[in-house]
């Protein structure tokens, strides 16, 4: 994250990440959150938050109005994921997307055993999950290309460590830095 960046955090939850970026990197910006309790938590942290439904897109924001737009564990909850990827690239000079990587080897093993995976990043049973889609590192590469987005950097994360070798199989989280 660039020092002093103007940031938009989509699905910001309690605002903890944005608060940390403000404190440690001198960032400014907004969180967008739909949940009442999370909006209150943002306000209590001193994080500027807008209570909006991402199904309606980001039409309130001009092109390139943020240095960075974050979608950290948000994409898998969105019905309009493809639209929101394009919107992320439109309103931000760059976007950072992170999501649970369904192709991580323990997930594959669960499916081979006939069960949907339940992990730290996918902590719900199939019947009560807020995730409406699952994706893989490689699937996102294809999706970004299909939507005319440039992948500036991509890697996986596993137990706090960066995974660059075989991230589709070895990483529980996929992370992409994108732009138009």
Give residue ranges: language-model regions:
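Glycine-rich SAM-binding Motif I of class I
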Residues: 15-19
């Amino acid at each position: 994250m660039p020092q002093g960046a103007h940031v938009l955090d989509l699905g910001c939850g309690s605002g903890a990440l944005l608060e940390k970026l403000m404190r440690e990197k001198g960032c400014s910006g907004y969180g967008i959150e739909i949940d009442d309790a999370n909006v209150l938590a943002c306000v209590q942290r001193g994080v500027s938050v807008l209570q909006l439904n991402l199904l309606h897109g980001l039409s309130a924001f001009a092109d390139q109005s943020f240095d960075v737009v974050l979608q950290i564990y948000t994409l898998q909850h969105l019905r309009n994921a493809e639209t929101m990827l394009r919107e992320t690239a439109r309103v931000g000079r760059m976007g950072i997307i992170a999501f649970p990587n369904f192709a991580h080897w323990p997930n594959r093993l669960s499916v081979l055993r006939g069960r949907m995976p339940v992990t730290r990043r996918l902590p719900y049973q199939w019947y009560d999950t807020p995730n409406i889609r699952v994706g893989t590192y490689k699937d996102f590469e294809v999706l970004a290309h299909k939507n005319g987005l440039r992948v500036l950097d991509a890697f996986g994360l596993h137990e706090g460590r960066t995974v660059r070798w075989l991230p589709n199989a070895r990483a529980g989280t996929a992370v992409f830095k994108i732009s138009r």
